[in-house]
């Protein structure tokens, strides 16, 4: 799946699991229809709603040089009742 980077595990995303909503970080250039298609194809579920927002990059400093990280996009995907995504593993750091 080129468009989906990884699942997000924050306090809010864990709370949303109870409402059958899953949170993913996705490629910034991906469209909503592409993400919906990939989720339905890969996980075998039916998507009824998608919300997205773009998170800004962070400012990083290395000595006198000031730079920033890239912004990224986060999607909150709501599934039809009766469908669920199998347990996702956390990304190890």
Curated annotation (Swiss-Prot):
<dbReference type="InterPro" id="IPR013025">
    <property type="entry name" value="Ribosomal_uL23-like"/>
</dbReference>
<dbReference type="GO" id="GO:0003729">
    <property type="term" value="F:mRNA binding"/>
</dbReference>
<dbReference type="GO" id="GO:0009507">
    <property type="term" value="C:chloroplast"/>
</dbReference>
<dbReference type="InterPro" id="IPR012677">
    <property type="entry name" value="Nucleotide-bd_a/b_plait_sf"/>
</dbReference>
<keyword id="KW-0150">Chloroplast</keyword>
<comment type="similarity">
    <text>Belongs to the universal ribosomal protein uL23 family.</text>
</comment>
<dbReference type="GO" id="GO:1990904">
    <property type="term" value="C:ribonucleoprotein complex"/>
</dbReference>
<dbReference type="GO" id="GO:0009536">
    <property type="term" value="C:plastid"/>
</dbReference>
<dbReference type="Pfam" id="PF00276">
    <property type="entry name" value="Ribosomal_L23"/>
</dbReference>
<keyword id="KW-0699">rRNA-binding</keyword>
<dbReference type="GO" id="GO:0009941">
    <property type="term" value="C:chloroplast envelope"/>
</dbReference>
<keyword id="KW-0934">Plastid</keyword>
<comment type="subunit">
    <text>Part of the 50S ribosomal subunit.</text>
</comment>
<keyword id="KW-0694">RNA-binding</keyword>
<keyword id="KW-0689">Ribosomal protein</keyword>
<keyword id="KW-0687">Ribonucleoprotein</keyword>
<dbReference type="GO" id="GO:0003735">
    <property type="term" value="F:structural constituent of ribosome"/>
</dbReference>
<dbReference type="GO" id="GO:0009570">
    <property type="term" value="C:chloroplast stroma"/>
</dbReference>
<dbReference type="GO" id="GO:0005840">
    <property type="term" value="C:ribosome"/>
</dbReference>
<dbReference type="InterPro" id="IPR001014">
    <property type="entry name" value="Ribosomal_uL23_CS"/>
</dbReference>
<protein>
    <recommendedName>
        <fullName>Large ribosomal subunit protein uL23cz/uL23cy</fullName>
    </recommendedName>
</protein>
<comment type="function">
    <text>Binds to 23S rRNA.</text>
</comment>
<dbReference type="InterPro" id="IPR012678">
    <property type="entry name" value="Ribosomal_uL23/eL15/eS24_sf"/>
</dbReference>
<dbReference type="GO" id="GO:0006412">
    <property type="term" value="P:translation"/>
</dbReference>
<dbReference type="GO" id="GO:0019843">
    <property type="term" value="F:rRNA binding"/>
</dbReference>
């Amino acid at each position: 799946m080129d468009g989906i980077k990884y699942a997000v595990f924050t306090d809010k995303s864990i709370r949303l699991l109870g409402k059958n909503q899953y949170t993913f970080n996705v490629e910034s250039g991906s469209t909503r229809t592409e993400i919906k298609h990939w989720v339905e194809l890969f996980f075998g579920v039916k998507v009824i709603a998608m919300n997205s927002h773009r998170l800004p990059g962070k400012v990083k400093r290395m000595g006198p040089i000031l730079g920033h990280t890239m912004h990224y996009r986060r999607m909150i995907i709501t599934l039809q009742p009766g469908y669920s995504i199998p347990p996702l593993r956390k990304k190890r750091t």
